[in-house]
UniProtKB/Swiss-Prot annotation:
It comes from Candida glabrata (strain ATCC 2001 / BCRC 20586 / JCM 3761 / NBRC 0622 / NRRL Y-65 / CBS 138). Aminopeptidase that preferentially cleaves di- and tripeptides. Also has low epoxide hydrolase activity (in vitro). Can hydrolyze the epoxide leukotriene LTA(4) but it forms preferentially 5,6-dihydroxy-7,9,11,14-eicosatetraenoic acid rather than the cytokine leukotriene B(4) as the product compared to the homologous mammalian enzyme (in vitro). This is Leucine aminopeptidase 2. It is found in: Cytoplasm; Nucleus. SUPFAM superfamilies: ARM repeat, Leukotriene A4 hydrolase N-terminal domain, Metalloproteases ('zincins'), catalytic domain. Zn(2+) binds at H322, H326, E345. It catalyses: an epoxide + H2O = an ethanediol.
């Protein structure tokens, strides 16, 4: 059992007690919500009526039925007003019984309000400041959006597998809860399964129970419901650092150990130097099965990760730096609603890149930012509703599904705002004390954008004129691309030079022999995998190419096929999923027809939405029949969220 680390006291430029309330700019004040933290309209619960002390989860996992059943117990206190009912979020749950202080009470499940689920209304006459225990007995159903259950045939071994994905509003599909990032609780979990279990907390032991085992966990730092993470399957583990293990299926263990060993502890120490000590005790990684829909999920103590990180060259490990950074931004300091998601993800990308910069140099940090800028452009250009979803501060108060708003915007637009602030305020030496101040001030709390702004203006009171000159309207509330910061482009310039050479020679040379004399495999030998990714992306986007020189690759088949032949080792034979995807993007753009079926086959081996969704869009653009047939064949192997979003992308 590992006790929570005690947070180191970090010196600030002035004591918190001396901070005075500072007005923002007139424009920002006109946008200020009536209350801060702003109310979360993505929950149906009456979370504002109670203070929560602790949550206990008692779960039984049934692979045979593909269900989780059991109960959840909340230790609650009413606030200064009496209440007549307790409202919880549910979604596709069967609720069997509700007890207040061990006494059964009446309840009803209201009609479903898509996409927010069904409100569970519990009759309870409770006076002000009353402490009580609320127990709800429940079971998930076949329509559960929080879990994916895999048969042995869908895994890499002979055992079934299950995992949860609760962000943004799917905790309510796993257990009745106050499903809002505004509401944080410590947790105890007792999870019974026939296979090993991992959880977003620290393991405290296990108890045999016939053919099953009850696995016990605790989470002593308050977290919101969406950060609860559960997985169960044929899991084994190995050490990858002094406070870290990796968990995965047996056949992947050696690759995972090689990929992650030594680097994870470096990441933790670098982040601690930037902010303050890691508070969660252990930092472990679960490398999930192929159908896992995200790059990673920052479940406290147990990062859930995609197997596409295993690139066999350590180049994708920056995703772990991202999920680790969430230990401060998102997990310790949390957005109060999904309108302010950038406070989680923008800060996390910023910290991730500070880690990368500290370990590999500032040009590497800036190169990562350039890649992110390109991703942001692609994301906004492909949005169905950029007017609504490309603003940094979102407005989901009309009941919009936060999953529909999910994009690169909160990550990259958020990062670029923080990078811009770092730059105009005087660089890291000026900005770093604010980072520590911000995370210290809001630790274990949830906040909105205006609380961030208030803290920023208060801390940099002596630089108010600089902050007043920031175009806050464009950065926070306008759709589209933000102003582009100045990046160090050294690593990108080498890529852009090679791209431009290919564009020119594609129009001049006519035979594969001529291309082989002009280009060679060594062109890419000094590039890291991220530079290869940018190279392939820029061959398609041609943002670095003069307008009058841009080409359509489909008209230059000899050039495109020569390129793939010359760079076979670094491109077509790569095991790095980032490179593989960009390779297919180039080939489909060049209308190389054999690649269509190859891409379709590859979509059956990955579940990460970063690749699956644009992969289907690429396929749809060149062969809609193949795209639809491939999706119909594979749809039940994807996570429910991924399946639904691809269905929307294909307009099915």
């Amino acid at each position: 059992m590992i006790n929570r680390l005690i947070q180191r006291i970090v010196p600030f430029s002035r004591p918190l007690s001396t901070v005075k309330k500072t007005m923002l700019t007139p424009f920002l004040e006109s946008k200020r919500p009536q209350q801060s933290p702003e109310y979360d309209y993505s929950t149906l619960s009456n979370y504002k009526s109670f203070q929560i002390k602790h949550t206990t989860l008692n779960f039984l996992l049934s692979f045979e039925k593909s269900t989780v059943s059991g109960d959840v117990v909340f230790d609650l206190t009413t606030l200064k007003e009496a209440v007549k009912h307790i409202d919880l979020d549910t979604s596709y749950l069967d609720v069997n019984e509700v007890l207040v202080d061990d006494k059964p009470v009446e309840f009803k499940i209201e009609e479903r309000k898509q996409p927010l689920g069904s409100k569970l209304v519990i009759a309870a006459e409770l006076e002000a400041e009353r402490q009580f225990k609320l127990r709800v007995k429940f079971s998930t159903t076949k329509d559960c959006t929080a879990l994916q259950w895999l048969t042995p045939q869908q895994t890499s071994g002979d055992k079934p597998y299950m995992f949860s994905q609760l962000e943004a509003i799917h905790a309510r599909a796993l257990f009745p809860c106050f499903d809002t990032p505004s509401y944080k609780s410590t947790f105890t979990a007792n999870i019974e399964s026939t296979l090993p279990v991992v959880f977003s907390g620290i393991a405290t032991g296990s108890t045999p129970n016939g053919e099953s085992t009850v696995y016990h966990f605790k989470q002593d730092i308050p977290i919101p419901a969406y950060l609860v993470g559960i997985a169960s399957g044929d899991l084994v583990s190995a050490s990858i650092g002094p406070r870290s293990k990796v968990y995965t299926e047996p056949h992947r263990l050696d690759d995972c150990v090689w990929e992650f060993s030594n680097d994870v502890e470096k990441f933790i120490k670098t982040a601690e130097n930037l902010i303050f000590d890691y508070e969660w005790g252990t930092y472990d990684i679960l490398v999930n099965v192929d159908s896992y829909p995200y790059g990673g999920m920052e479940s406290p103590n147990m990062t859930f990760a995609t197997p596409t990180l295993i690139a066999h060259d350590k180049t994708n490990i920056d995703v772990i730096a991202h999920e680790l950074a969430h230990s401060w931004s998102g997990n310790l300091v949390t957005n109060c609603s999904w309108n302010h998601f950038w406070l989680n993800e923008g800060w996390t990308v910023y910290i991730e890149r500070r880690i990368v910069g500290a370990l590999h140099g500032e040009p590497t940090r800036h190169f990562s930012a350039l890649i992110g800028w390109s991703d942001l452009e692609n994301s906004i250009n492909s949005m169905r509703n950029p007017e609504k979803f490309s603003t940094l501060v979102q407005n989901l108060n009309d009941g919009t599904d936060p999953d529909d708003a999910f994009s690169t915007v909160p990550y990259e637009k958020g990062f670029n705002l923080l990078f811009h602030l770092e730059t105009v305020l005087g660089g890291p030496q000026e900005f770093d004390p604010f980072i520590r101040h911000y995370f210290k001030k809001f630790a274990r709390q949830s906040l909105d954008t205006f609380q961030f702004l208030d803290t920023l203006f208060e801390f940099f009171e002596n630089k108010r004129e600089i902050l007043e000159n920031v175009d806050w309207e464009t950065w926070l509330f306008k759709p589209g691309m933000p102003p582009k910061p100045q990046f160090i482009t050294t690593m990108a310039d080498n890529v852009f030079s090679l791209v431009n050479k290919w564009i020119v020679k594609a129009q001049e040379l006519k035979t594969t022999e001529e291309f082989s004399k002009e280009f060679s495999e060594s062109d890419l030998s000094e590039f890291n995998s991220n530079q290869v990714v940018l190279f392939l992306e820029e061959l398609v986007a041609q943002n670095c190419v003069p307008v009058e020189s841009k080409i359509e690759w489909s008209k230059y088949s000899v050039a495109s096929e020569s390129l793939l032949s010359i760079y076979k080792k670094q491109v077509t034979e790569s095991q790095n999923a980032e490179v593989v995807f960009k390779n297919y993007k180039f080939q489909t753009t060049a209308r190389i027809q054999p690649s269509y079926q190859q891409l379709a086959n590859w979509l059956g081996t990955v579940g990460r939405m970063k690749f699956v969704r644009p992969g289907y869009r690429l396929l749809n653009a060149v062969d809609r029949d193949l795209a639809i047939a491939t999706f119909e064949k594979l749809k039940d192997t994807y996570h429910p969220i991924c399946k639904q979003l691809v269905k929307q992308d294909l307009e099915l």
